[in-house]
Amino acid sequence: MADWSLLPNDLLELIVGHLETSFEIVLFRSVCSSWRSVVPPQDQSRCLSIKTHDISFNAGFSFSGQPTDHPLFGSTLTKIPIYLVKFWTPFGDDYLLAEMREREGGEPMFLLSPLSSNRIIYGMGINKVLFNSLTSPIIPFGQYYEITYSEKQPIRYRYGLPCHLWDKLEWVEITERVEFLKLDSEDSRDFAVLFAGRMCNLVMYRSRNMSWTQVVEHPEKYAYQDLVAFKGKFYALDSSGRGRVFVVELSLEVMEIPSVRGSQQSSKENLVLSGEELLLVQRFTPEVRHYDEYLYTWFRVFRLDEEEGRESGFKLMTLTTE
């Protein structure tokens, strides 16, 4: 096994120059003492410095697909890193899959479970988990992107608010999941963002022209439920449960990949990146069972098949224990 402590300082300084956030510096310093001597501790850092991009809106643009007569403020694109944390307990080793977020208003930084729909916060109440970054391995596991913007919406019912004000509009901050694609350019700063907007639409942002563009509207009633960037293209999965996947080119051209034929409607399906392959995973769960549904749940996994650079369809994979 390589001895990482023997790396020369000039190489370590080169690595540090490519770190984007203060938390990456924490991970860098946790490797060994010689690495810690290259970078001082981040004692004065009050945040994680999660990487963000400021994105502007076109005049009259809205995510709903309808023209608007009021200006939209800019939005913020945020990269949310996910880590696998290994720590020790009296009962043995344990693992925590968590996403990292900025602290707010001087509050301590916190971890969120990316698998939890109710956004359980680790570090508060009964879910409190303490670990030492020098002794607990922290492994980068992945990342996703979200966009935060403000939009005018009808005022919802509020206690004590006169009823004649319920139909007024107010600015509401909204956060949505998006897919990010880094593009080849001389300065390595060009990127594209795909967002599954409302009314079954897709909208794309290009940093080169700094504007959002409406992608061709979905020809049917199903919305898009999953987006993935893969090999310089976007892939979108609709919510039909029938394995319908669409390729979205940067030119805004949309093409449907031959669907998974002969498939019954799945209860849930997702696009998954696995190394250099794109997988379609379908989950089938009986509708009438709840407490023991895991006993009757089964999956089908398909791999995207490519021929001469074009997508020919998804083929069923045979999974083994080897």
Curated annotation (Swiss-Prot):
It comes from the Eukaryota. It holds the Pfam family F-box. Gene3D superfamilies: 1.20.1280.50. InterPro entries: F-box-like_dom_sf (IPR036047), F-box_dom (IPR001810), KIB1-4_b-propeller (IPR005174), SCF_F-box_domain (IPR051304). Residues 2-50 form the F-box domain. Coiled coil: none annotated. PANTHER family: DUF295 DOMAIN-CONTAINING PROTEIN, F-BOX PROTEIN SKIP23. This is F-box protein At2g16300. It comes from Arabidopsis thaliana (Mouse-ear cress).
